[in-house]
Amino acid sequence: MLFINITFACILAIRFYSLSISIRHEKALIAKGAIQYGKRNSTLLSIAHVAFYFAAIIEANKQNLSFNSTSQIGLAILIFAIAMLFYVIYELKEIWTVKIYILPEHQINRSFLFKYVRHPNYFLNIIPELIGLSLFCQAKYTALVGLPIYLLILAVRIKQEESAMSHLFPKS
């Protein structure tokens, strides 16, 4: 259980580091005149994300888990998700935040990843992260209850993001 708790703390520290990047980018975007969209949804996503993390580790500690093959698969998925998070941050540079901000002269990223994967931050980072965390902590109840709730909030987020950016895409 000690390994799971220490690894969880490390993953949490990485997420806090990514949040600090987001806050720094957000301040710069606001200074450049960016407008935030979906503020209430961003708050709900943040609450759901934090709740998911804590529910998973509480569930793990109640079970007094050992690091087994399920946890190993979960950790591998988490490592993939974290790698994707930082790749997305690298690709989006200063426009990456955990919120939706659109600049007056917003440019669409057309790199390889964004060309072939729609919403890579959600589908290659967030969803795998939550699945990986559930497996790592063997938190089946957190997954069964938390994932559907999170996915509903995320679906709204994707629609809001697409709506906010619709003027940036040519009409066909």
From Swiss-Prot:
Name the record gives this protein: Uncharacterized protein HI_0318
User: Which GO terms of the molecular function aspect are on file?
Assistant: protein C-terminal S-isoprenylcysteine carboxyl O-methyltransferase activity
Instruction: Give the organism the record lists.
Output: Haemophilus influenzae (strain ATCC 51907 / DSM 11121 / KW20 / Rd)
Q: Where are the transmembrane segments?
A: 1-21, 41-61, 72-92, 136-156
User: Record's Gene Ontology CC terms?
Assistant: plasma membrane
The membrane-topology field of this record reads: Multi-pass membrane protein
Keywords in UniProt for this one? Answer: Cell membrane, Membrane, Transmembrane, Transmembrane helix
InterPro entries (alphabetical): ICMT_MeTrfase, Metal_cation-efflux_comp
Pfam families named among the record's database cross-references: ICMT (PF04140)
Q: Where in the cell is it found?
A: Cell membrane
